[in-house]
């Protein structure tokens, strides 16, 4: 099973760009990643891939409105980057709107995530800021690593205060989320805002070149323009994932040793 990374947070905090940069970093060694977004108010397929012609039947809406979701259905609706075949994306297609599909069910999101994690090494769930979109709470519940990105201003702080009570259930692991200051600029009161929310794990500063990549439809090229603080935050995420993988490997070794011991005992 692949690792599931959930990216959520306040509007305008740079979640979509971070998801693309993270996907590029995770696939440097030719491992595979899928980014999934289910925010129909802004269909992401034409934003991610403005130069690729994408048919409507590639939409994630077709998957989420299915009776049952399995790996073959998911694989058939992943759009692979022509310029970088280790990354696939799933989202809504150009022209789709909230009336294009039936209401998404929480259980179907969980099925989608589970199926996607069986296909690739990493699944990045890029969430809407709107918690009434069931994809967001389901993605937070599903995440092996959850990344919370907030603008370091009053909007970001009050977004968090408003949504924290909705994530109080233990299945959301609220206290284990990594928190980053997104679109941080020199004039932001980072220390004060960090004190209010309980501290930052790192900064994802605003950069003109990164912004230009988003504007020009080259989001997957932006990793080349990350400044040292952005890169340090990205490395924290990569380190956290590496620690998880090491822990999983150790657990598998323990299970194998236990099974081997039990077999030897049975033979005696």
Regions found by a protein language model. Name each.
Residues 122, 145, 199-202:
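Well-ordered beta-strand positions
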Residues 216-268:
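NTP-binding/hydrolysis catalytic cores, primarily Walker-type P-loop NTPases
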Residues 2-41, 45, 116:
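Walker A/P-loop phosphate-binding motif and the immediately C-terminal alpha-helix
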Residues 182-224:
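Beta-strand-loop-alpha "switch" segments that mediate conformational coupling across diverse proteins
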Residues 134-153:
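Inter-motif core of Ras-like GTPase G domains
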Residues 35-118:
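P-loop/Walker-type NTP enzyme "switch/lid" segment
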Residues 103-110, 161-187, 222-225:
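P-loop/Walker A phosphate-binding loop and immediately adjacent motor/lid segment at beta-alpha junctions
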